[in-house]
């Protein structure tokens, strides 16, 4: 079945910041705390917390770090309140960009996000200006290695997956509805499947090709956003030039 994640194309542009393991753990730690605040500290009764714990483990986050984040959100180790704010806007060539933040200072985050858009040749827009161009989907990325494609596809679809993409060179990409994400992930985990990445995210309906000049500008924007302490996720619909390397 064909998919539309273009996972490899996008991940190649994120590798520079994703290699900073400490930043990743900080971002996931914030998500854990917000999930606990909203639904309680027990993963048995808090589906969102269970999903984020799985995401943390896929990122090789140590168990004691996960536990510490949960305790902090429960008030056992003090507490910090984060506000979830979504920013939308445009990059070079009209690329659609959604920036998800968790912040304890919305004035700081708004200023930093706006600055990143400007420095990257884009502009921050109003709420909803590009959101309609994306769909919220669950996505699990699995290393192909020696796995049988047909067997993997049947496992995913039987578990309730919406789509299975084997077009990428090195990975399978399983797509679900947000509601079915946890169920499908747990079913695949029960079969011994491990994930390179597993999360609910915003996936664009279509992609916008950009040339090398705009790719350089846009990469600058992505680096600024992804290095910002308040930014959790950056979603976009840019298709970088073939063979593009930062």
From Swiss-Prot:
Q: Which GO terms describe its cellular component?
A: cytosol
Q: Which GO terms describe its biological process?
A: regulation of DNA-templated transcription
Task: Keywords in alphabetical order, please.
Answer: Cytoplasm, DNA-binding, Transcription, Transcription regulation
The intrachain disulfides are none
The answer to whether keyword Electron transport applies is: no
The answer on whether this UniProt entry bears the keyword DNA-binding reads: yes
Q: Which Gene3D superfamilies match?
A: 1.10.10.200, 3.30.70.980
Name any one Pfam family assigned in the record.
Answer: Transcrip_reg
NCBIfam families xrefs: PRK00110.1, PRK12378.1, YebC/PmpR family DNA-binding transcriptional regulator
Family listed: Belongs to the TACO1 family.
Q: Know the name of this protein?
A: Probable transcriptional regulatory protein CLL_A1008
């Amino acid at each position: 079945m064909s998919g539309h994640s273009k996972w490899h194309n996008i991940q190649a542009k994120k590798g520079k910041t994703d290699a900073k393991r400490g930043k990743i753990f900080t971002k996931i730690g914030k998500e854990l705390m917000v999930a606990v605040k909203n639904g309680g500290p027990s993963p048995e009764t808090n589906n969102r917390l269970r999903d984020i714990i799985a995401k943390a483990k896929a990122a090789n986050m140590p168990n004691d770090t996960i536990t510490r984040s949960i305790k902090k959100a429960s008030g056992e180790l003090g507490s910090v309140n984060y506000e979830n704010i979504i920013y939308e806007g445009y990059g070079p060539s009209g690329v659609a960009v959604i920036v998800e933040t968790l912040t304890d200072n919305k004035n700081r985050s708004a200023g930093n996000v706006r600055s990143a858009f400007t420095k990257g040749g884009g502009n921050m827009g109003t709420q909803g200006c590009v959101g309609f161009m994306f769909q919220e989907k669950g996505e699990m990325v699995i290393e192909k290695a020696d796995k049988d494609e047909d067997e993997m596809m049947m496992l995913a679809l039987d578990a309730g997956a919406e789509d299975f993409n084997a077009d990428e060179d090195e990975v399978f990409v399983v797509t679900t509805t947000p509601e079915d994400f946890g169920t499908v992930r747990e079913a695949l985990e029960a079969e011994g499947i491990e994930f390179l990445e597993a999360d609910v995210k915003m996936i664009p309906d279509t992609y916008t090709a950009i040339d090398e000049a705009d790719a350089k500008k846009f990469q600058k924007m992505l680096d600024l956003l992804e290095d910002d302490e308040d930014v959790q996720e950056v979603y976009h619909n840019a298709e970088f030039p073939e063979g593009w390397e930062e």
